[in-house]
């Protein structure tokens, strides 16, 4: 397991005192960690950030390019949406294998292989001659990108140790949160200046740089002894997650979750996932994802909190730029600029949150973060309901929401592994990555369905959509709707604005309620810092 790799890995610093037992004897085989964030650790964090930001920015950049794909390939929005869905399904398929692969091949080699796969996928996407090949190459990207987050986190957890984990996650989290904010700006500029292919070509120098730096900076870790791979677990979980998320992601196009094209794959996926849970719980050796980690109270509460929080948070992420573009008539680049307060709020809060987590444990700071997210999202919903201009309500809500993200997301990830033994960290980080992905995917689909439901119950919006789909409007080819093509009736534009704002406000309020409900599992997170107490360690 990863224990061999972690225990035998080259230390970043060798001058720290050797840990001793209560009887005063050094603990043989254990690694010592300095209290400060040394240069070696910061270099390792920098390489992890470089690769992770590349993958995170790519997601937001591709979302900005959806209309451009429709126009250039002469396709439909339903087909083009698979450039996002295919990537998501690839993530769901590969993330469960990250823990085993880290143990089997070593985190250093797995990280470099993941960066290489993502970079090659980017090159293939850039030269794709049609929409079908673009979707296929996005899946290749997803196979590489799916490994990056859990493997990067395992590397950082190994190099930082429990006493420095909160601070190093704060250092890493700032650029990772700012990256997606800059994605729409970068994407809008590249598409306008050079064309959509450059949103993929820009990944090549970044990916190659991360590959070279990883080879230089990362310490060599020894893969664990060969173990029996859990093929049955893989055959149950990966298709289960992919099938379930396929069904859920199909719901916005169907307008309801009650459609058979949604229910059949979703129920099939849930059945496969349930079978995997039973298989993993009773498999005595090397399960793909060790569900027995949930016997650790800190792991269970952190994963439950992350899943519920992702439901409300990631669904609202999808709708923020959509609202700014559709209702406030902003361009993709403008909407990206106007979401910057969210990133600035996270940047302000994250260093404080990391230091507090190291001193006091994750519970209090996560609770504060969730309350801030709810307050910020509620403020934004209030501005939307009032049909307010961007200033001053909307940026205020975004900034408060960003501060909450800075106080909650990284501490939750840290809480999921902070009480685990070294050989369990890769499996623990894989577990919370899977739950975050599943929660975010369900939340995104849920918010899209709710918004579609609100749109379908407005005659004004239905009329506007019919106009937008006519060839004369240009919207079917990815262009904006010509206001002169709207029906010439009294106050039609004002009524359309009212109905659009009401639809978005309802969805944002529901997202806020989901975030508030996260306070329940978060209240049971560990109240103490990890070095002061250790949860019972499970055999792996």
Curated annotation (Swiss-Prot):
Its main location: membrane. GO terms for cellular component: extracellular region; plasma membrane. It is a multi-pass membrane protein. Belongs to the major facilitator superfamily. EmrB family. The gene is emrB. GO terms for molecular function: transmembrane transporter activity. This is Multidrug resistance protein B homolog. It is found in: Cell membrane. InterPro entries: EmrB-like, MFS, MFS_dom, MFS_trans_sf. SUPFAM superfamilies: MFS general substrate transporter. The lineage of its organism: Bacteria, Bacillati, Actinomycetota, Actinomycetes, Mycobacteriales.
């Amino acid at each position: 397991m990863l224990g061999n790799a972690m225990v035998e890995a080259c230390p970043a610093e060798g001058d720290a005192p050797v840990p001793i037992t209560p009887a005063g004897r050094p603990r043989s085989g254990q690694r010592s960690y300095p209290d400060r964030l040394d240069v070696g650790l910061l270099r390792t964090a920098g390489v992890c950030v470089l690769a992770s930001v590349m993958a995170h920015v790519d997601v937001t950049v591709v979302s900005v390019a959806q209309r451009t794909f429709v126009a250039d390939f002469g396709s439909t929005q339903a087909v083009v949406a698979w450039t996002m869905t295919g990537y998501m399904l690839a993530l769901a398929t590969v993330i469960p294998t990250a823990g085993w692969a880290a143990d089997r091949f070593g985190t250093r080699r797995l990280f470099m292989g993941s960066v290489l796969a993502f970079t090659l996928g980017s090159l293939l996407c850039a030269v794709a001659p049609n929409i079908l090949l673009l979707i296929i190459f996005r899946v290749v990207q997803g196979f590489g990108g799916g490994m990056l987050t859990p493997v990067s986190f395992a590397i950082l957890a190994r190099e930082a140790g429990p006493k420095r984990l909160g601070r190093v996650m704060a250092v890493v989290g700032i650029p990772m949160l700012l990256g997606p904010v800059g994605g729409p700006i970068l994407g809008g500029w590249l598409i306008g200046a050079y064309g959509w292919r450059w949103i993929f070509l820009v990944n090549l120098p970044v990916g190659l740089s991360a590959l070279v730096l990883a080879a230089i900076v990362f310490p060599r870790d020894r893969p664990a002894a060969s173990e029996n791979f859990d093929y049955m677990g893989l055959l149950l979980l990966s298709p289960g997650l992919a099938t379930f998320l396929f069904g859920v992601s199909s719901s916005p196009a169907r307008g309801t979750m009650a459609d058979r094209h949604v229910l059949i794959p979703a129920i099939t996926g849930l059945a496969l996932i349930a079978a995997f849970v039973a298989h993993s719980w009773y498999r005595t050796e090397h399960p793909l994802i060790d569900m027995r980690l949930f016997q650790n109270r800190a792991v269970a509460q952190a994963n439950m909190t992350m899943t519920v929080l992702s439901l409300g948070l990631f669904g609202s992420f999808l709708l923020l730029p959509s609202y700014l573009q559709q209702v406030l008539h902003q361009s993709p680049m403008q909407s990206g600029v106007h979401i910057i307060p969210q990133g600035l709020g996270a940047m302000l809060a994250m260093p404080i949150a990391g230091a507090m987590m190291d001193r006091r444990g994750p519970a209090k700071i996560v609770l504060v973060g969730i309350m801030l997210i709810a307050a910020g999202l509620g403020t934004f919903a209030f501005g939307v309901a009032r049909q307010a201009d961007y200033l001053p309500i909307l940026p205020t809500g975004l900034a408060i929401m960003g501060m909450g993200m800075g106080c909650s997301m990284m501490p939750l990830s840290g809480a999921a592994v902070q009480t685990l033994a070294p050989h369990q960290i890769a499996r623990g980080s894989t577990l919370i990555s899977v739950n975050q992905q599943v929660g975010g995917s369900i939340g995104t689909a849920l918010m899209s369905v709710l918004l579609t439901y609100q749109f379908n119950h407005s005659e004004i919006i239905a009329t506007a959509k019919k106009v937008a789909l006519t060839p004369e409007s240009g919207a079917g080819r990815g262009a904006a709707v010509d206001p002169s093509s709207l029906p010439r009736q009294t106050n039609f534009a004002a009524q359309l604005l009212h109905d659009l704002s009401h639809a978005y406000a309802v969805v944002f309020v529901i997202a806020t309620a989901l975030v508030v409900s996260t306070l329940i599992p978060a209240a049971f997170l560990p109240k103490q810092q990890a070095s002061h107490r250790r949860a019972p360690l499970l055999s792996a």
